[in-house]
């Protein structure tokens, strides 16, 4: 410690010598960099497209082209290979950036919405709302979102961060109640428009045009099975339709919460797999294409999400855990030995810090006490 103090003292002495001393203690006020005429002029004259650069002109151009990676440790006992597309690398750390961009572009091209005039209203379970709020902020729309109150605090903060208005709905009414509230607002709000993620073909289209081709290209066309959780149904339908168009033998599976297994003939119910299990069949969901819809419990999804962080270094959300559980169920079947199964991790785990996923760790972190340090 004495040696450290001696070093710091010598370092301070060096910095304060000669011209450096005069500069540090000068009474002259330096002009801020951003206020200097040369800086401002340089920014104004900067071309949007500099030849030979890879600089994007706007953040929406960062959407897509996410990486895909094998799972290695959690797949012990599996006869098939499991590769996962990591949508956490999107601008808002979720796959919903894709359809949010697609649906807004589609509506603008059709003249249905106008920046600065149209108020966008949309029901969401979280990630789509964040992506829409992100796009609305970038394009200049006022955004109003309805969401069940059981969703995580991080979702609410993210939506508000992008300037969206947020209305929470009765958790016992599920997504059905959230959708109803959004339609009520639509009817009572002038110049309002709903992009309708659950019935908008542009939702499916973007996955047919981007997510599906990316998976096909990155697997060199060797994907045998694709499995995906069902929320709006856009991802599983769009990706499934594309993969089937390239190889009719590719098998497509959906995933839904066991506690809200509506697609398997059950009843809607509360669950922890945010983003999945909306409690009804979305219009854009192509059920006929699916081999079947695999049921995963909230408990299994949460436990798997935790294991993915601990064993694979992948901090992901609860629906990512559900997709992985379903993929592993298929990977353990003898008939799938040696096959390549692809699924998706839709979002980054940091968005779930206040949820059941990190409940114990959060409590542990909140109760941590500082230790004494002999310094200086």
From Swiss-Prot:
Keywords assigned by UniProt, alphabetized: Amino-acid biosynthesis, Cysteine biosynthesis, Lyase, Mitochondrion, Pyridoxal phosphate, Transferase, Transit peptide
UniProt keyword Amino-acid biosynthesis, yes or no: yes
An example Gene Ontology molecular-function term: L-3-cyanoalanine synthase activity
InterPro entries: Cys_synth, Cys_Synth/Cystath_Beta-Synth, CysK, P-phosphate_BS, TrpB-like_PALP, TrpB-like_PALP_sf
SUPFAM superfamilies per the UniProt record, alphabetical: Tryptophan synthase beta subunit-like PLP-dependent enzymes (SSF53686)
Record localization: Mitochondrion
Role this protein plays: Probably involved in the detoxification of cyanide that arises from ethylen biosynthesis in ripening fruits. Has only background level of in vitro cysteine synthase activity.
Family classification: Belongs to the cysteine synthase/cystathionine beta-synthase family.
Protein name as annotated: L-3-cyanoalanine synthase 1, mitochondrial
């Amino acid at each position: 410690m004495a040696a450290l103090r001696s070093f710091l003292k010598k370092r301070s002495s060096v910095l304060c010598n000669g011209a450096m001393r005069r500069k540090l203690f000068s009474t002259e006020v330096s002009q801020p960099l951003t206020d200097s005429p040369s800086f401002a002029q340089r920014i104004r004259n900067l071309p949007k497209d500099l030849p030979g650069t890879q600089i994007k002109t706007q953040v929406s151009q960062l959407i897509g082209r996410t990486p895909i990676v094998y799972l290695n440790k959690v797949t012990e006992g599996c006869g098939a290979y499991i590769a996962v597309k990591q949508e956490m690398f999107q601008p808002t750390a979720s796959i919903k950036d894709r359809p949010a961009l697609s649906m807004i572009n589609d509506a603008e091209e059709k003249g249905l919405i106008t920046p600065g005039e149209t108020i966008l209203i949309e029901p969401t379970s979280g990630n789509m709302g964040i992506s829409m709020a992100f796009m609305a902020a970038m394009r200049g729309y006022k955004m109003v979102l309805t969401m069940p109150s059981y969703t995580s605090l991080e979702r609410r903060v993210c939506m508000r961060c992008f300037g969206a208005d947020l209305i929470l709905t009765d958790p016992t009414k599920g997504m059905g109640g959230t959708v109803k509230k959004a339609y009520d607002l639509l009817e009572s709000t002038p110049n309002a428009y709903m992009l309708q993620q659950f019935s908008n073909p542009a939702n499916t289209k973007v996955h047919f045009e981007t997510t599906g081709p990316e998976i096909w290209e990155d697997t060199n066309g060797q994907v045998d099975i694709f499995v995906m959780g069902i929320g709006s149904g856009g991802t599983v339908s769009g990706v499934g339709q594309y993969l089937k168009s390239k190889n009719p033998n590719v098998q497509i599976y959906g995933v839904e919460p066991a506690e809200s297994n509506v697609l398997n003939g059950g009843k809607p119910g509360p669950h922890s797999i945010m983003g999945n299990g909306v409690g009804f069949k979305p219009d854009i969901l192509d059920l006929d294409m699916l081999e079947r819809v695999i049921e995963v419990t909230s408990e299994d999804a949460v436990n798997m999400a935790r294991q993915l962080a601990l064993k694979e270094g992948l901090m992901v959300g609860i629906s990512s855990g559900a997709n992985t559980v379903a993929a592993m169920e298929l990977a353990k079947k003898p008939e799938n030995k040696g096959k390549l199964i692809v699924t998706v991790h839709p979002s980054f785990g940091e968005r779930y810090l206040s949820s059941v996923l990190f409940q114990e760790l959060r409590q542990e972190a909140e109760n941590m006490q500082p230790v004494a340090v002999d310094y200086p």
